[in-house]
Amino acid sequence: MDIPTPSRTFDITVDGEEKTITMSYGLFNEIMRVIPSPELIASLIVTDADLRDYVIRRMLTGNKKVTTDADLVDPFDLDIDMDRVDELVAWVAEHVLHFFMKSAAKTAKIGEKYQGTVEELTRLSQSQTGAEN
């Protein structure tokens, strides 16, 4: 399965200035902490206002360490086009889904590669513990 990689950067105008957001390792990890499963992507986009707000504010804060909510940009101080905000959320969702899909594909390949070995180890461990073969 060939899954295209999302763009590493996203351009958005904030307060009249062009800003480029780069999906760095640290930024991606912070997003993954609040979106632990692909099923939550729908919540991010549609139903969970708090999750959506955090993701937007975190992205607009940039690649710096955030330890408290006060470290995030204040949404009331932002002059930003809402359509671009929706596109930003979709860009983040694309990165998260890409990660889960690529990880699942890699894990499936590893499972196929070692299936016989795992079955043999399972059989051996059962026979050593007295379980029937």
Model-derived regions, located:
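Short, surface-exposed, charged amphipathic helix/loop patches that serve as local interaction elements
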Residues: 2-7, 25-133
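Short, isolated positions in well-ordered beta-strands
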Residues: 19-21
